[in-house]
C-alpha cells in the first residue's frame, strides 16, 4: 500500500504543478467588502502565479473584529486552496501533495489570520467569502475559468450521531441528523 500511496501523492503533485506551469506568470488582486457588525469588512488578496506555485497574500484585508467572525489562517487557507483547486485542477485528487503548491499568507491579527485569543466562533461568516475574493483575482489572470460568484461558496453537509437522552431502552439509542444547505 505504501507504493500506491506514494504514487498517488506524487502523481497529484506533478499534475497540479503542470497545471500551474501552464498558467500565465502574472499577479492580480481581488477585493470585496461585506457588511460587518460595526463597520464594513474588506477581504483583499493578491494572487501570483510563480513558476510551479501560486501565492495568495491577504495583505490589505481588514483587521480583527470584536465579534467572532475572525478566521484563523488555517481556515482561510482551506478556502483559498479550495478556490484555486476548483479553478485549475478539480479532477486531481485533493491531498497534501496537490495542495502543497498553493502558498497562502496573511498578516497576523487580521480578519483572515486571527491569533489566540481573538474570537473565531463564527469564522464561517467571513471564511466562506474567501473563495469569491480569490476567484475575483484569479479571473483577471485566467478569464472565464473560475465559477461565477454565488452564495459565498457555501456548501454545507453536516452529519451527526448523538445519544438520545429522551429514548427508552435500548440504552444505546442514537439520534441521526443529516443537514445540507446551499450549493456554492
Regions found by a protein language model. Name each.
Residues 1-184:
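Glycine/proline-enriched, intrinsically flexible loops and inter-domain linkers
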Amino acid at each position: 500500500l505504501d507504493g500506491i500511496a506514494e504514487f498517488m501523492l506524487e502523481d497529484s503533485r506533478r499534475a497540479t504543478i503542470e497545471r500551474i506551469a501552464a498558467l500565465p506568470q502574472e499577479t492580480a488582486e481581488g477585493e470585496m467588502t461585506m457588511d460587518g457588525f460595526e463597520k464594513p469588512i474588506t477581504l483583499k488578496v493578491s494572487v501570483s502565479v510563480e513558476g510551479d506555485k501560486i501565492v495568495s497574500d491577504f495583505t490589505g484585508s481588514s483587521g480583527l473584529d470584536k465579534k467572532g467572525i475572525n478566521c484563523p489562517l488555517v481556515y482561510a487557507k482551506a478556502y483559498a486552496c479550495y478556490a484555486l483547486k476548483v479553478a485549475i485542477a478539480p479532477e486531481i485528487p485533493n491531498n497534501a501533495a496537490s495542495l502543497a503548491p498553493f502558498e497562502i499568507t496573511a498578516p497576523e491579527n487580521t480578519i483572515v489570520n486571527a491569533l489566540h485569543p481573538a474570537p473565531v466562533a463564527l469564522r464561517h461568516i467571513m471564511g466562506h467569502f474567501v473563495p469569491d475574493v480569490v476567484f475575483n483575482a484569479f479571473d483577471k489572470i485566467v478569464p472565464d475559468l473560475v465559477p461565477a460568484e454565488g452564495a459565498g461558496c457555501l456548501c454545507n453537509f453536516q452529519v451527526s450521531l448523538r445519544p438520545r437522552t429522551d429514548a427508552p431502552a435500548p440504552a444505546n439509542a442514537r439520534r441521526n441528523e443529516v443537514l445540507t444547505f446551499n450549493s456554492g
